[in-house]
Amino acid sequence: AHEINNPVNFIHGNLSFANRYTHDLLELVHLYQKYYPKPDLEIQERAEKIDLEFLIEDLPIILSSMQVGTERISQI
């Protein structure tokens, strides 16, 4: 169990930072969208290519599920 818990604890400990950084970056993206609602074509194309709206919605969910997963593993 120690061989599993030790690396999982590293991941779990860093997820709180990843959540905070993600939240901050997504807030910044929202500010850009608010103040620059009509970006250049290159930015529009890139946003469509990476499906930015889905990414903004899904990334926090992914991080949350990773948090739950590491908590469950550490309870084993």
Explain the meaning of each model-derived region.
Residues E3-Q75:
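Histidine phosphotransfer helical core of two-component systems
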